Each structure stands twice: as C-alpha cells, then as structure tokens.
Design a protein with these regions (language model features):
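Glycine-rich phosphate-binding loop signature in dinucleotide/nucleotide-binding domains
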Residues: 9-12, 120-122, 177-185
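Active-site neighborhood of HAD-like aspartate-dependent phosphohydrolases
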Residues: 2-54
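A metal-dependent, Asp-based hydrolase signature
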Residues: 49, 59-97
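Substrate-recognition element of Asp-dependent hydrolases with the DxDx(T/V) motif
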Residues: 89-106, 111-142, 153-156
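Substrate-recognition "cap/lid" segment bordering the active-site pocket of phosphatases
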Residues: 131-187, 197
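Acidic, Mg2+-coordinating phosphoryl-transfer loop and its flanking beta/alpha structural elements
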Residues: 183-216
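Alpha-helical tetratricopeptide repeat
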Residues: 87, 139, 190-193
Length: 216
C-alpha cells in the first residue's frame, strides 16, 4: 500500500515515520472555523461591521494566506479604519482568544486507518510548531496519544522559537530517534515548505501531503 501511495519513498529501508500535525493529520480549516468565531465577535466590537461579515473576511483571508501568515487580524482592522492604538489592543485580545481556545477536532477515518497501519510496521513520532498550550489541546482533542507515545512527541513551543522547524534541535527530545543510524531510515510527512526544509536539514526522506492524501 505505502509504495503505491507514496512511490517517491524508499520504503525498503524505512524504520521510522514522523508527522507534522496541523494540515498533515487533519484539515486545519476545521480548527480555524472554530477559533475565528469568537475572534470575529471581538473584532466586530471595534468596527461598524457585523460579526458574520468579519468572520467571513477572516476565513477568506486565511484561505488565501494560511496559518503561517501573521497579519490577518491587523489587515482586517486596517480595512475597517480602526486606529492604531485600538488595533494593538484588539490584536492582543484576539491572540489571547486564539491561544486559549479549546478545540473540538477529530481525525478522518482515512488518517486513523493510515496511522493504525503504519503503527504496526514502524516507530512513530510527531513534531509540531506553535504555542504549546494550544498544540497540546489539539493533540488531545484528536486522540493522537493512541499512536504517539509522549516521549516521541515534540512540541517545539515548549522550548522556544529556536526549536521551531526547520531547526533540527527538537529531534534531540524525540526518544525513538536515538535508534536512527541512517537518516534515510526516517520518512517525515508534512504539508508545508518548512516541513520539507526540516527533513532536508536532517537528511530524512520527505512526503509533502495535506491530510495524508496520495502523492501526485
């Protein structure tokens, strides 16, 4: 199955499989539509627009730019002529809402099946960037502890920005990677260019995929 789905990987030598989380194991839009609702409500208080109008604008901009883009809230406020001092206050409150949000997420049947399959064949690990409180909440909401042991999960936000991908530093905190003697034994799945660069730095094989869709 794996050779058919991801033919660019040399599966004959793979012993360890790693994953990014957001966008790789689940559709991140499912999180965004949740967290942007209270954020839209807060931004609407600073504008003359309705909560629904702001909500739609936020979602459309996220679809255009993605989560790596950090100017979405600022752009919406500027579009609505909110003065700089109020923009700063509003953005800080929006970021607080974002970071403290309790997500309600589920894995697709496809991803659950895939994880069950590879769990029986390889050692698994996960590495995710972002604020540690929120990333842990996503991890638990998705039920990922069924496949990833705590010692093989790297929350880079726990250690500081210098540990974020593409930095290889976080791998020192992944227990199972102590067993690797050839980096080509490892394949890493991710959805972003930063995941690809991370794998390249370490010499890992890499699959760029969204929600574990087939290559090509």
């Amino acid at each position: 199955m794996l050779k058919s789905l991801f033919p660019n990987v040399d599966w004959d030598i793979v012993e360890f499989v790693g994953f990014d989380m957001d966008g790789t194991l689940y559709d991140e839009f499912n999180f965004i539509i949740q967290v942007y609702r209270p954020i839209a409500k807060r931004i609407a208080l600073s504008t003359k627009s309705t909560e629904q109008e702001i909500y739609n604008q936020l979602l459309l901009r996220w679809m255009e730019k993605g989560s790596s883009y950090n100017k979405i809230f600022d752009e919406i406020l500027i579009r609505h002529n909110v003065v700089e001092s109020e923009r700063e206050t509003t953005i800080n409150e929006c970021l607080r809402i974002f970071r403290k949000h309790t997500p309600m997420l589920t894995l697709s049947d496809r991803v659950s099946f895939f994880l069950n399959y590879v769990q029986n064949k390889y050692g698994l690990f996960l590495i995710t960037d972002g604020g540690v409180q929120l990333q842990k909440a996503k991890f638990h909401s998705l039920g990922l502890s069924s496949w990833f042991e705590e010692q093989n999960v790297g929350f880079t936000g726990l250690y500081g920005s210098e540990y974020s991908k593409p930095s290889p530093l976080i791998t020192k905190n992944i227990k199972i990677l102590e067993e690797v003697f050839n980096p080509k034994q490892v394949v890493f799945f991710g959805d972003r260019e930063v995941d690809k660069k991370f794998a390249e730095v370490l010499g890992f094989q890499f699959v760029q995929t969204y929600c574990l869709q087939k290559e090509g």
